[in-house]
Amino acid sequence: MNSKISVSNLDSNVIDIITRILKSQSNTDVDNATDIIIGAISKNILTLQDDRDLSSIKQIFQSINDSECAFIGRQIDNEIVFTVQDIAMYLARDTFNPLNNDVNTFIKYSWSSYSNKQGTNEKRDTINIVIKNQNVETYTYTKIDLPYLLVHVARYLSIFN
């Protein structure tokens, strides 16, 4: 990591992403999503209630237009998808070194644990992306996964603070 990110800067970057993505939604939806996501980031352990809260805002993210979240994603087969590296780079404002693939591993195992608690065995597609001339295989996520991804990527990045 090139420089440290303060938790307050991280929170500010998360709020910026939520506000940009949900700009066409009601202020209540934006405030609710922001409160839930920032609240979950600040906790050491996510509780069942946190899982329920994150699940409750998934539909808000699913209903947004792809163009509203394209700035942190990439288009593959006419769908906007997200990678952990893209979100980490955006949250860290390009100060995160994605060649450190620990963040991808952190999310992969967090996602597995989260999916198992939810009683699902969701499979994730993988894509290859090139970062600094290195090929990195990574999982792709969709709009409905954004609340979860924002929480866990931000929690991972806050470890370095």
UniProtKB/Swiss-Prot annotation:
GO cellular component: virion component
Keyword annotations of the record: Virion
Subcellular location: Virion
Assigned protein family: Belongs to the mimivirus L761/L899 family.
Stated name of the protein: Uncharacterized protein L899
Domain of life where this protein originates: Viruses
Principal place of residence: virion
